[in-house]
Structures are given as structure tokens and as C-alpha cells.
């Protein structure tokens, strides 16, 4: 599957670079709406009370406690732009994949998972071929060393300081589906890579 996603994306972008393309107006409208939603959300001061979210689970407990206690409000001045980059990369990825003929079965959907007496919410990125995939923007170093030829699932698992694996399995469990892995765009070069999760996932699902 990873080769199919990458093959279709690379083939489409290569064709566009040589010949151009007439995009589906519906996809252009969806992209515009996603960008607008990101700008409004990131600039808004109405972020509500802290609640545990799938995107924060798997990270160090001390960091989660700081966020709960309000430390997340002390963002550095460039944080907003960094968050917007992530949102826009997701919107670009979805536009390109749909235009390349990849069947996206679900996208940017709110999900909730019951964990004991508590529930945790989140927003999954995409479902493709019956699996949940996470879209990431990455620095050149992370692109190569974490998700690319020099990295991979096993290397991410060895030092998963951001909780990517736990988050992926929580999203997938909320949909009762397997976790596909990560679709990653190098934010410096625009290159793509698909980093797949293993087919046998039961052990990692339990750990998540």
C-alpha cells in the first residue's frame, strides 16, 4: 500500500510539473475551507478548557501535566506559524492525494475513545484502504532519519518522544481499524515518504 500511495502521488505531481492540471473545483473549495478553518482556529483565543487529547497522549507525563496546568498558553512567538504549517501541509496532502486518484475514505473526522472511566477525543487525519493514517510535516533531518530510508517504524518506536505510535493506535482503535502509518512531507523540499506500520499490530495496540 505504501508504494501505491507514493507511486500515485509522485506520478501525479510529476505530470503536473510537466503538463499542468485542471483541478476539480470541489477539491479546490475543500482545500480553501480547510485553510480558512486553520487560520481562524489558530488565531482564536477561545481554545476552551484543557482536556486530554489523542494528539498529546504518549508524550512525557510531566509535559502533559504542564499543559493541563496552563503551561501550554506560554507559547513562543513562532508557535502559531508552526502549527499553521502543520495544518496547511495536511490540507495540501489531502488535495494532492485526492487529485492523484487515491480514495480517501474519511478525513479530518472527530473521534472519541473510552479508556476506562475516562474518554479521550481527537481528530484523525485520513483513512485509506481501511486503515488510519497520520499526516506529518517534517524537517529534512526527521524526514530522512525518522520516517525515511534511515529511519522507519522500528526506529520511531525506539525513541518515540512525541508519542506518534501511541497516538496512531488510539486513532485507529477509535475507528476499529488498523493503523497504516505516516504520510510525511519534507517541509523544506516538498518530498514525500510513506512510513508503514507493521501488519502484526496486536502487541503495540495493547501498549498504546
Placement of each model-derived feature along the sequence:
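Conserved alpha C helix of the protein kinase catalytic core
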Residues: 89, 167-170
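Metal-dependent nuclease catalytic regions and adjoining charged, substrate-binding loops involved
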Residues: 145, 158-160, 170-208
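Metal-dependent nuclease catalytic cores that hydrolyze phosphodiester bonds in DNA/RNA
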Residues: 1-132, 137-155
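Alpha-helix initiation and capping sites
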Residues: 87, 162-165, 206
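Amphipathic coiled-coil/heptad-repeat helices and related helical stalk/stem segments
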Residues: 119, 164-167
